[in-house]
Amino acid sequence: PYKPKKYHTPKLMGEKMQLDVKYVPRECNANMWDDNRYYQFTIIDEASRERFIYAYKDHSSFTAVDFLYRAVCYFGYIPRIIQTDNGQEFAYFQETDRIHPFDLACEKLGIIHKTIKPRTPRHNGKVERSHRSDNERFYKHLRFYDYEDLQEQMKRYLCRSNNIGMTPLNYRTPVEMREYLISRGMTDYLEPFDKKTGLIL
């Protein structure tokens, strides 16, 4: 019988990140006149488990590119690899000579973009599990009134969630793990990213 290969989590911060999108549950929207759908983009560093999340009104490829730049600005460095599923935000469904906008953005930043095999969400397990935690910790209690309110509440939740101790990190928080990895020199290979100018330093 087939046995999946054991997955080895990167030990270096920025070596690999997982990126995914989830729907914001409609029932969280307290404004009955608002018919918009909202989407949460999420990226997680595999080594530190630090995340960045941001809400959008669509999940197009151009939105994915915008999120990529926001994420790099948030983390302050360029990751080596970003792994996604094969959603339309990140890849074309059919083979084509055209380069996807998300691939172009990754190429410009020097990031390797890897996609998982179709119908294998477990291969993006860390970001998938983080979404389940979001449902329990955030969306289960969330009521927002407009897009700006959603963004503000999501921003506060992100700060809180990055400061919760995690068993895989020996009960360190993602923020503490980031500082630990920096102190051990396990980030020296990363290219820093200037948040003000949008340039690689």
Go through each PLM region and give its residues.
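RNase H-like polynucleotidyl transferase catalytic core
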Residues: 84, 103-126, 142-145
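Active-site beta-loop-alpha junctions of metal-dependent nucleic acid enzymes
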Residues: 36-37, 53-77, 81
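Acidic/histidine-rich, metal-coordinating catalytic segments
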Residues: 59, 77-94, 117-119, 171-174
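Short small-residue beta-strand/loop micro-motif enriched in glycine and branched aliphatics
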Residues: 49-54, 114-116, 140
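Charged helix-capping and loop-helix junction motifs
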Residues: 96-101
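Mobile-element integrase/transposase regions
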Residues: 1-44, 50, 66, 74-75, ...
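C-terminal domain-tail junction helix/linker
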Residues: 2-8, 15, 109-111, 133-201
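Mobile genetic element proteins and their domesticated derivatives, centered on retroelements
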Residues: 20, 43, 49, 68, ...
